[in-house]
């Protein structure tokens, strides 16, 4: 594209559009990545949309760039939507700038991508990776022959005995078989007193004997889990339950290579290539302390020079490219533990951790009663006060809504006071909520809203282009009901439609940064106008807290003033086994009650007797709202239990776990 920078000629409509796109790309790189573009030519360029994170491979991008001259270096940071290129001369980089800006290419998934280039003073990338495997981790390449691999794969019959749930299950896009003992996913344990008939398959015997003889394992396994994964799916990060299995856990990768992510509790992440026919051995720290998981995607970032060499993926961004995943089957062997775990990692050991307060029962009836008392009734009674503290929409939710095509039909499931219903006037939005009083507030604001349950939305299947569910699903009291809520969202979407979901996070400190919920927020001089419009300083502070918090301003405390003993204290609500969470502190239980001190407006509010507390014409009664706060990876795991959806994006946003789903 030939662009007139001098302004002598009048820019065409397409040129104006291009300049806007290029400027936006420059702004996004500066804001989110700290990459500063310069206005004068240099040898180095940053290429927005040309990264591994966009599905652009090194080979494809290099072929495009070399048409402008010899490339001295092409740097492609892992999982990032941009790349750096360094040409030998400034003239060559100028040629790339003028000829490739706005160029359309097709990524490895067949989607159109437009490149936007800007000059940078220096192409650089801060290496944050670890260059060594986690202690106790071993990857052995070519541990079996191709003939042995074929025998193992052919021994798995996925069509027989599908009705027998004792050893075969379908986890949507992941098929699972158990031998020796069934692994119970709801409790992450095995029933040690109920072995499955038949033991381990005979085809595994010679391989296990070989591993024992060569010293890769010390104990012969008695439990086997076989998983089959389609490209694009993975496993949430987890640690195999300490009390269920012994130290050694080994896994064979068959059919396709994969990159597995290992993460230390302090935040260090290591990506490890598991080649086809390789053996992964986890012992000691890597087994007990580090989480392991597989990110759901169709391509892995690998080293270009050694694509399928086992071991750590180095952080050399001059040698990274994409590798397409295939159908992978894993054989994971474990030894069931018979004695209590006495490992050195008590902070993550289910046996050694300090006992937590009892949680709720899984009974559907009791779950419904809990939700009725500590969610439905409470929000109906605090609706007016709650609405007065909810004005400011969250930027990334606004971004999602504004990116939708004009005329899209969008459902806000659990819309509250409707603060997102009017964000984009070009959309047809409808809201629903379980609270009649909150729906009435929506109608007063001229929004379309109705009363219904999020598990049974009276809207035709496949009729929505998009849905949002903001701070709703964490109010359901069982894992099954939370998955049902996700399934209902998926039912509403047309094929290709997207859903944005926010839930409150257990991790209120993430990547060494405390959420605004823990930090609180001082009122600055610039906030006077909003403060003056609020009924109190406390209400202003509430509006600055994370989306899922809905915090009671009257109970806000400085987390630094809470002692360790007070943090663990389990205050109880009458007739409830759930602990009351202390606001502005970290969570120590996933199932909690969060207080709300109701402020009444004598001229408007009716004197409502709170159903969540005994006693009562208290002018400032306390209500307790039920929450299930989600751990890292839990929301993605719940989404994977839903059929016909794929996870487009997952991220952390100020104390909330968030995903974008797409109906397939």
UniProtKB/Swiss-Prot annotation:
Keyword hit for Zinc: yes
Enzyme class, one word?
Answer: transferase
Q: What catalytic activity does the UniProt entry give for this protein?
A: 5-(carboxymethyl)uridine(34) in tRNA + S-adenosyl-L-methionine = 5-(2-methoxy-2-oxoethyl)uridine(34) in tRNA + S-adenosyl-L-homocysteine
Localization per record: Cytoplasm; Nucleus
Q: Superkingdom of this entry's organism?
A: Eukaryota
Any Gene Ontology biological process: DNA damage response
Query: Which residues are involved in binding 2-oxoglutarate?
Result: 227-229, 328, 334
- Cross-referenced InterPro entries, in alphabetical order? AlkB-like, AlkB-like_sf, AlkB_hom8_N, AlkB_tRNA_MeTrf/Diox, ALKBH8_RRM, Methyltransf_11, Nucleotide-bd_a/b_plait_sf, Oxoglu/Fe-dep_dioxygenase_dom
* Matching Pfam families: 2OG-FeII_Oxy_2, ALKBH8_N, Methyltransf_11, RRM_1
**UniProt keyword list:** Cytoplasm, Iron, Metal-binding, Methyltransferase, Multifunctional enzyme, Nucleus, RNA-binding, S-adenosyl-L-methionine, Transferase, Zinc
Which co-factors does it depend on?
Fe(2+)
What are the binding positions for Fe cation in this chain? 238, 240, 292
User: Which residue stretches belong to region Methyltransferase domain?
Assistant: 411-664
Residue intervals of the Fe2OG dioxygenase domain: 220-337
Q: Name one GO molecular function term.
A: tRNA binding
Q: Which family does it belong to?
A: Belongs to the alkB family.
The task this protein performs is described as: Catalyzes the methylation of 5-carboxymethyl uridine to 5-methylcarboxymethyl uridine at the wobble position of the anticodon loop in tRNA via its methyltransferase domain. Catalyzes the last step in the formation of 5-methylcarboxymethyl uridine at the wobble position of the anticodon loop in target tRNA. Has a preference for tRNA(Arg) and tRNA(Glu), and does not bind tRNA(Lys).
Q: What is known of its domains?
A: The Fe2OG dioxygenase domain does not have demethylase activity with methylated nucleotides.
The subunit structure is: Interacts with TRMT112.
Write the protein's name: tRNA (carboxymethyluridine(34)-5-O)-methyltransferase ALKBH8
Protein encoded by which gene: Alkbh8
């Amino acid at each position: 594209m030939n662009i007139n920078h001098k302004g002598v000629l009048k820019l065409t409509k397409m040129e104006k559009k291009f300049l806007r796109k290029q400027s936006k790309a420059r702004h996004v790189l500066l804001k989110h990545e700290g990459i500063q573009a310069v206005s004068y030519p240099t040898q180095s360029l940053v290429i927005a949309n040309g990264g591994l994170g966009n599905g652009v491979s090194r080979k494809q991008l290099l072929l495009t760039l070399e048409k402008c001259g010899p490339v001295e270096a092409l740097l492609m940071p892992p999982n990032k939507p941009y790349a750096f290129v360094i040409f030998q001369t400034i003239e060559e980089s100028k040629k790339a700038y003028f000829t490739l800006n706005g160029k359309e290419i097709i990524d490895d998934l067949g989607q159109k991508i437009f490149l936007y280039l800007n000059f940078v003073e220096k192409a650089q990338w801060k290496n944050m990776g670890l260059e060594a495997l986690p202690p106790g981790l071993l990857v052995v390449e070519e541990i079996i022959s191709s003939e042995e691999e074929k025998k193992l794969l052919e021994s798995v019959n996925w069509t027989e005995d599908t009705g027998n749930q004792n050893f075969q299950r379908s986890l949507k896009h992941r098929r699972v078989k158990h031998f020796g003992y069934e692994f119970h996913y709801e409790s992450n344990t095995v029933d040690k007193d109920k072995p499955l008939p038949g033991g381990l398959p005979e085809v595994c015997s010679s391989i296990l004997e070989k591993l024992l003889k060569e010293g890769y394992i010390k104990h012969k396994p008695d439990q086997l889990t076989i998983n089959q994964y389609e490209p694009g799916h993975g496993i949430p990060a987890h640690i195999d339950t300490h009390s269920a299995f012994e130290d050694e856990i080994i896994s064979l990768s068959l059919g396709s290579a994969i990159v597995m992510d290992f993460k230390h509790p302090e935040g260090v992440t290591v990506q490890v290539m598991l080649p086809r026919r390789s053996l992964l051995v986890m012992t000691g720290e890597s087994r007990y302390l580090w989480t392991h998981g597989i990110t759901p995607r169709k391509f892995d970032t690998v080293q270009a020079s050694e694509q399928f060499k086992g071991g750590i993926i180095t952080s050399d961004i001059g040698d990274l490219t994409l590798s397409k995943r295939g159908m992978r089957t894993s054989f994971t062997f474990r030894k069931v533990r018979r004695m209590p775990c006495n490992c050195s990692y008590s902070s993550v050991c289910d046996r050694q951790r300090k006992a937590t307060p009892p949680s709720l029962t899984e009974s559907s009836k009791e779950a419904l009663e809990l939700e009725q008392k500590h969610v439905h009734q409470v929000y109906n009674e605090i609706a007016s006060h709650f609405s007065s503290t909810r004005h400011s929409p969250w930027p990334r939710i606004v971004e999602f809504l504004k990116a939708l095509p004009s005329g899209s039909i969008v459902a806000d499931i659990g819309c509250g006071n409707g603060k997102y219903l009017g964000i984009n006037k070009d959309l047809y939005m409808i809201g629903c909520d379980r609270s009649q009083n909150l729906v009435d507030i929506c109608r007063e604001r001229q929004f379309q809203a109705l009363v219904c349950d999020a598990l049974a939305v009276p809207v035709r299947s496949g009729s929505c282009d998009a849905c949002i569910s903001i701070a709703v699903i964490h109010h359901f009291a069982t894992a099954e009901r939370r998955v049902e809520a996700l399934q209902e969202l998926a039912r509403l979407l047309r094929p290709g439609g997207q859903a944005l979901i926010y839930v409150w996070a257990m991790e209120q400190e993430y990547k060494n940064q405390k959420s605004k919920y823990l930090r609180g927020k001082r009122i600055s001089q610039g906030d006077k106008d909003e403060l003056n419009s609020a009924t109190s300083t406390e209400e202003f502070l509430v509006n600055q807290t994370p989306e899922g918090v809905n915090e009671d301003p009257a109970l806000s405390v400085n987390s630094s003033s809470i002692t360790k003993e007070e943090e663990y204290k389990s205050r109880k609500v009458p007739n409830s086994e759930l602990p009351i969470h202390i606001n502005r502190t970290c969570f120590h239980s996933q199932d909690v009650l969060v207080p709300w001190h109701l402020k009444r407006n004598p001229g408007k509010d009716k004197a409502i007797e709170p159903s969540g507390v005994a006693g009562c014409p208290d002018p400032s009664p306390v209500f307790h709202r039920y929450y299930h706060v989600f751990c890292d990876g839990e929301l993605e795991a719940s989404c994977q239990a839903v059929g016909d959806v794929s996870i487009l994006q997952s991220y952390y946003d100020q104390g909330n776990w968030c995903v974008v789903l797409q109906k397939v």
